[in-house]
Design a protein with these regions (language model features):
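Positively charged n-region of N-terminal signal peptides that target proteins for export
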Residues: 1-4
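Bacterial N-terminal signal peptides
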Residues: 6-15
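Short S/T/G/P-rich N-terminal loop/turn motif that feeds into the first structured element of a domain
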Residues: 20-234
Length: 234
């Protein structure tokens, strides 16, 4: 992806990733900054935009540190790109070097800086590289907390049901600058079958911490989208 970032300095340090084990270990420290880019293609250019977003920016210090997820069901965006920036990010007034191949393919986009876990932890939870395989499915959610309920919503969104039968990968990101939401969550399922089984079991846990009823006690608004991954391919 052609980087949108080139001076404002943004530091990480306020988010966590939740381990995929059914009794999660202590959450790792949130040390890094990520750039979350939601975008929609102009009519007829969705495939071309996806291809453009999947090209690593060789000018970036970490050109391979990003994922591109593609909308399947839910919100109005076509793609979300989550780019790892390291422990801090800088924005300058200087225009990015070279042309942006995605610029004329976008109908709109939104950009938000968030804090999150290390790239190693993010990669593990999202099933990137190594022995990861199959056809993972993701649920990307954004939430804004009710005033005074930030801590409660954090707990709701980061609690994993220890009795859950489906193992998932989970990343929790906290807004630093940009969009109107407070938190973003990404849940990885190993297959559509796992996603279906988890959703079928959801009504039975609605009232528990992290369940449907619980989250709605603390969230002013939310948007959830089912997506697949187009970059990296493995």
């Amino acid at each position: 992806m052609k980087s949108l970032l080139a001076c404002v300095v943004i530091l990480g340090g306020t988010a966590i990733a939740i381990g995929s084990a059914q009794t999660p270990p202590a959450a790792p420290a949130a040390t890094d900054v990520y750039h979350v880019h939601f975008t929609k293609a102009v009519p007829g250019q969705a495939a071309a935009l996806g291809k453009a977003l999947s090209v690593p920016d060789k000018a970036s210090p970490m050109p391979e540190h990003f994922v591109v997820l593609r909308h399947q069901e839910g919100d109005d965006w076509d793609y979300v790109v989550i780019e790892h920036m390291g422990p801090k990010a800088e924005v300058t007034a200087a225009a990015p070097g070279g042309p942006d191949p995605a610029r004329d393919l976008r109908a709109w986009h939104s950009d938000t800086f968030v804090s999150g876990p290390s790239w190693a932890e993010f990669s593990r939870e999202m099933g990137l590289g190594g022995s990861a395989g199959g056809s993972p499915v993701y649920i990307v959610g954004v939430q804004r907390a009710i005033a005074g309920h930030r801590d409660q919503l954090t707990k709701s969104l980061t609690t994993i049901d220890p009795a859950a039968k489906i193992v998932t990968g989970n990343v929790f990101l906290t807004h630093l600058e940009g969009g109107e939401w407070t938190f973003a969550t990404i849940t990885r399922y190993n297959s559509w079958t796992d996603l279906g089984a988890d959703r079928a079991a959801a009504p039975g846990t609605a009232a528990s911490v992290g369940g449907w009823d619980d989250i709605r006690q603390h969230s002013a608004f939310h948007r959830d989208t089912i997506a697949d991954r187009i970059y990296p391919a493995k």
